[in-house]
Amino acid sequence: MAGNSAPARNAGLALAEQMIEAHGGAALWNQLDAVRVRAAFGGTGFRMKLLKVPIRATIIVRRGGQHVTLEPYPSTGRQGVFEGSEVRIESADGRVLSRRAQPRRAFGDFRHLLWWDALDLLYFAGYAMWTYLCVPFVFTDPAYELHPAGTWQEGGDTWRKLHVRFPSGIHTHSRDQVLYADQRGRIRRHDYTAEPFGAWARAAHYSTGHQDFNGLVVPARRRVHPRRAAGSPRPHPTLVWINVEDVAVAAGNHCLPAESGRRPLVSIYAC
């Protein structure tokens, strides 16, 4: 995608701002220090790499920088830490049990064609969850190139497309990604190439069951399917699935108070 002209950036930003508002708004997001999600995930893509799934974990994504923790991971009494250029597995008392620097560079060799280890999955899951929870809020950063890309008809609905080029220093699936917003601005589909799997791994990622968790709108279900070159998805297999069970948010030294009338599913963790 060519560099962002001012008119294109402005048009793309207008759509991005609608998405941001539909997912809770910039004012809420800018208050937050972290988002905690309890979720389970699995799928054919992981089984292809000889990984034991499903995995159920508490995932904490810090706002600002790329820092994600998964616990328990890869087993009880341990946690995984993703920090972009490094992943590590720690014991309950914080001892580093294993570490990999520059984990993205490890993909592409013969071993990775056959199987992934716990650090590989930690890198993939870490950047993926950072992407899913921080998008679309990060698009206010001018380092993200934004271009409106027309509309898309699917399932009787019309979705608006936003083509995004991520900054080169951000760990994510691929630099070029496309998001599809419904009339309310909620992200319903997200296209990318899952590069750690390979340049062939074109994905169509669907989000459904959006719920309001203390003001932050998060989809409860995510399903990832192969994407044909023309853009249509293949219904099978389900490469990745994610089921969100609970979401909590924290701001500063205090957790955000639950508002009356919110769903009882919402919980706030001790900051």
Positions of PLM-derived features:
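Amphipathic/hydrophobic helical signal segments and adjacent flexible N-terminal regions
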Residues: 1-22, 263, 267-271
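N-terminal mature ectodomain segment of secretory-pathway/periplasmic proteins
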Residues: 7, 21, 26-100, 148
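Flexible, processing/modification-adjacent segments and terminal tails
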Residues: 8-14, 91-170, 197-198
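Short, surface-exposed linear segments at secondary-structure transitions and domain or protein termini
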Residues: 62-67, 106-115, 213-214, 249-254
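A general structural signal for short secondary-structure boundary/capping elements
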Residues: 65, 80-87, 103-108, 133, ...
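Short, surface-exposed secondary-structure junctions/capping segments
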Residues: 115, 220-221, 258-262
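Intrinsically disordered terminal and processing segments
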Residues: 140-148, 236-271
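Gly/Pro-enriched, hydrophobic low-complexity segments
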Residues: 156-256
